[in-house]
Amino acid sequence: MRITAYDLQDLGDGYLAIQSSNGQSVVSNDLDDLLRFLRYSSKDTIRVFFDLDEAAASVLRKIPKPLLERVADHDTAVNIGEHHFFYYHDRVLQVGWTRYFGLKTFYGYPEYVPIISLDGVQEMADEVMATLDRMGIGDTNLLTSAVACFEASELGKQTYAGIPKGWEISPACYEILDYADQADHKDWVEARQIGHWESGLYDWDKTSCYMALASKLYDLRDCEFWKSDTMGKREQGASYGFARGSFYIYPDGERSHCSPIVATVVNDFLGNPVGRLPVDIYSLEEVRTVERYGIGEFDFIDGWFIKTMNGVAPRFPFKDIMNYLYQKRAISPLASSIAKGIGNQVVGKLIQKRDSDNSIRNEIYHALITSGARCEITKFLVENDIQVEELVSIQTDGVRITRELSEPTRNGLGSWRCNGDFPTIVVSPRKVYCQDKKPYRITYSDILDMVNEHPQSDRYSKKAERHITLAQAKAMGDIYRVGEYASAPARFDLLGLESEQCRIFSKLPRTGKQLLANRYNSEPVVFD
């Protein structure tokens, strides 16, 4: 199917100019004129803006306030004059039966992106369609997201049909779903050190970690389930499980810094404490990992266990699709972005609410994947004998360390790789600045420039002139600011840095100059 690019420019004084790559255009300050153009300017084509939210913002600003409130609530029965109207952030703009989509998410771009010409948008649109075709998921006219294209394809439908759902297990075993859910939602994201590394900080991650772990999971329809309050031989030999109990992580243990066990610590953040942790539920793999590497011990109360049925060769419901997506990454950088996004979003859908016929919710699988990622990091740290002073940060499926390691001989799905040794600034668990990464819309280069200009400051910001999107206006608590052309500040503050940490720092940088010139070590939270 054809795809047509669109561009919208705000000319001021209420006038908007909308142009399509097929040569159609309109310039008007009248909402009906603009909606009529969007509705009727092209036929039999997929229509795209690069940044859908930016384009929609100027149109939304013209909508009368009572109707705008309904649009903001995703009301599907809104009519503006003779035009049915629907808009969903980052997904779709619909006028009548004519739909518009955004390309930005396919390219993995952050919130703010450079302005791209209409010809450039058309080239990107053509690339997206060609890439989806080459990946076998191009048989759709709904470009709401990469995973939506996958779900609409025959490949996606067959994949979802073959994934066991949580509610399909015996009702007598439903409690294991609650155990799994309580063992989940514990991403390991920590800053062990804060400071500036111009070199000598190596970024390691496990390639397509969640996809790799999913590919190894057994089909639960080939398994038996049971609950036990003893950790006997049968329980120890289980394939999977979720155990309720309490960990004691050795405070002075040689490998306590490698612990995969996450709990709520300071500032209500998740972190890796040591000492006697409160009773919680953990995956069996976490218990095995802690005990195997001498990190601590576990006082078992009870748990749910899973093993393959005797005489049954287990199936692997995620194996084919995850390997397929990984192989398709080689097509192009765009294909790599799309394939990675689909794989991770399929995993994410394992804990989405069961609100549609194509729901694949399965708390067991999701908890096994996320806890498995933490255990993989522990295994990497222990087997490479990473010392506490060499570990700088952990970020879900990877680490940054100060020791150079030999590249592994194995590659492929789930292998460890070193992405390089890049200048990096670490400020807090979720503020790691390296290359063009943009935590909170600030880059490594931005920080250097701002600190060099004001070395003694503790607060920095830069501004970008953009239209306020509906999502941003909602976050501001005032939807009527949508479409307003305003300076959107991106801030970088050292004030209150303690409140961003999940570990104990005896000292922290107070100025930009101190941040760039020093490094700051931390200690874990100790539970009594």
PLM feature segments, named:
Residues 1-21, 208:
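Gly/Thr-rich phosphate-binding beta-strand-loop-beta motif of the actin/hexokinase/Hsp70
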Residues 21-528:
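Conserved acidic
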